[in-house]
Amino acid sequence: MLLRAYRPEDCPALAQLFYDTVHAVNARDYAPAQLDAWATGTVDLCAWNASFLAHRTLVAQLEGQIVGFGDIDVSSGYLDRLYVHKDFQGRGIATALEGALEGALSVPLVYTDASITAKPFFLGRGYRLVREQRVERHGVTLTNFRMEKPLLR
């Protein structure tokens, strides 16, 4: 597996991976209406590209195929997105991305808003639960969890 820096031409593929992953992997924890509100299929590619460029963004590739991505705001330590292709779950891709993204930080704490589905992954990586949250997307309420992890330097 190759971890590499994000390139603007990756954006459409990452948006598709995001949509496919949410609708397949997260379907065990969220209702169809929640999945549709979370991943509508109409991502603003310009806004996503700007966000990826403003953050440290890594792309995971396996045999030339994009199989995951993640991005983190290095100034605040906020892990914004971490997604692995629905067909490549459980292969250590999220762990590799998360570790590499955390390694780029000089702040003492990393934090994220984890889905119900991702919560066990983050607990296993040393994050602690701060609070359960209800967020609204397109008029639909979703549950997620603010989680944080101190970085030992």
PLM feature segments, named:
Residues 5-8, 16-87, 98-100, 104, ...:
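Acetyl-CoA-dependent GNAT
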Residues 92:
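Conserved G/P- and acidic residue-centered "switch" motifs that form tight phosphate/ATP-binding loops
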Residues 122, 127:
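Conserved active-site tyrosine of GNAT-family acetyltransferases
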